[in-house]
Amino acid sequence: MNTDTLMTKKDSKQMKYLQQAVRLLEKKGYREIKAELPDYESPTSFTERSSDKSYTPDLTGQKDFGKDYFQVVEGDKKNVQDVVSKWKLFANLAKIKNGQFYLLVPYGRKKYTTELLREYNIEAELMKLER
C-alpha cells in the first residue's frame, strides 16, 4: 500500500468520524457548528506562541453561553508532544470561552486517551464514536 492510499484511507476514516460528530452535535442542540467538512465553515486555527505551530480543532460549536472545542483522537504515538500541546491549547481556549473541550474517541483509543489526559493533566470530556 503506497503512502497516498494510506493517507486517503486515513482521511476517509477521519471524514466519517467528523460527519458522525456533526450529527451528534446537531442532535444535542449545538449551533454555529464549524468543521473541516464540505458545506461547513472551517474552524479558526490557533498558533501556539512557544513553538509557532498552528493547530485547528476538528469541530467547534456554540451551546448555551459557551463555545466548545472537539478533537477526534487519532492515537498518534509518534508525535505525543504535538498531541498534548494541541489538547492543552484547546482545553484552555474552551475554558476562556466558557465552554468545554471534548475528545471524540473512536473504538480502541480510550486507553491511549485516558492515559494522556491523566499523565499531562489535561481537562477534557470524552465522547465515544461508533466504529
Model-based region annotation:
Residues 57-86:
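Conserved catalytic cores of phosphodiester-cleaving nucleases, focusing on short active-site segments
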Residues 37-38, 72-76, 104-107:
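Structural motif
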Residues 66-70, 98-103:
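Hydrophobic beta-strand segments of well-ordered beta-sheets in folded domains
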Residues 91-98:
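Arginine/glycine-rich "motif VI" loop of SF2 helicases in the C-terminal RecA-like domain
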Residues 26, 95, 118:
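Anion (oxyanion) recognition and catalysis
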Residues 103-131:
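Domain-level recognition of nuclease-like catalytic cores that cleave nucleotide substrates
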Residues 14-21, 81-89:
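Well-ordered, non-membrane alpha-helical segments in soluble/globular domains
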Residues 2-15, 27, 32-67:
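Active-site metal-binding core of divalent-cation-utilizing nuclease and nuclease-like domains
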